[in-house]
Amino acid sequence: MHRRSTLFLEPSRRAGFILGFCLCPVLGTWAQTNAAPGQAPSNAPAPMHHHAQPEAGDCAGTDLKCATAVTPAFDAHNNLWVAWVAGGAVSVARSTDLGRTFTDATIIGRYGELIDVGADAKPQLAIDAQGRAVVAYGVFKDKAYDAQVWIARSASIWAKEGPGFGAPRSLSSDPASQRFPVLAFTSNGRLFAAWLDKRTVALARKQGRAQAGAALAYAWSDDAGATFSGETIAQDDTCECCRLALAFDARRQPVMVFRAIYDEHERDPAVIVLSSDGKPALQRRVAEDHWVIDGCPHHGPSVAVTADGALHAAWFTQGNARQGLFYARSENHGQNFSDPIPIGIAARQPGRPSLLASGNNLWLAWKEFDGTHIYIKERHSSDAGRHWTNERIVAETDHAADHPVLIAHDGAVFLSWTTRDQGYRLIQLEAT
């Protein structure tokens, strides 16, 4: 007999309470009705300023201090860029001192309550070696939580007049719902984007068939996001409300871990590898957790690839086989994974994993909550996940907090984290 979980979650608002943030009042409503909604960004060069500490309950504006979700990226000039959602707007800013100070924000677009601020709905930010940048995020289209993925592009974030992001436009040409984009540049400059897509679900409905979840869709760009081609459905039966995790292998092939739907009701982690011709080369179940759930977990996985070719996955589950946060590795490119290893203190609700590989060094960060404090913990492996250090606390707060994000630059590894009381922080991690 399967143990069945039931979650009664509204994908945007209620998920924010699980996230740990107060869901702040937002500014305005949909401001424009043309094909590229959103306020035109300010492209004037901006002065640097200190990132002020937010006051308790001060979360109504669009500033970084009010952010509910922050995504970092480094450029080739050693600048740190962050994209975030706050006050119903998507914004970006630059730091030249590892996050201690930031320029004034460039607002990509304002959407009011339509912006997707669900627990797994971080804005995406990718920057190539030439200083071209792309931001992607989701915006709801209706009360049924159908959404559209918007992208905004800068031809040069180093331009004297400012980063110059153009008007946002739809990533996909299909009118069906799309959510939870991920995007990244390969080492040779191609831009890969993937998202959860409802076009096959809509088609099944028209044909009188029921189809659970969403499809995993992807496309490529050879001009840094100016255009995308090869829009493809990789597979159906994907959990429609959990983020995708993306990495590239040594052959620059996309490796994604996501929550797949098995036997109509089980939602367990899966891996898919896309071959050089753009077609799925492999799809496997990472672990048989047998999480039977009538609802949306809003809790996506993480993935990394070490220099030895091993694939690494971390995920949260409440399955019949196991419950909590787990890690596993594959030495045969995803054909099989090791037995899942539990991560963190089970009584403290460990979750929200972030994996990062640098050579054969591997880091894993996650979030725990003891009823009063939120902790970010990490472990490190110097041999591609075969052996790990003991866990240690990197940061903590007793206020609302974003999920941890690990990022590497110039040989160093950092934890990117924002909290309501301490603001944005970039914390360097030392291999122990």
Residue ranges and their predicted role:
Residues 1-11:
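N-terminal secretory signal peptides that target proteins for export/translocation
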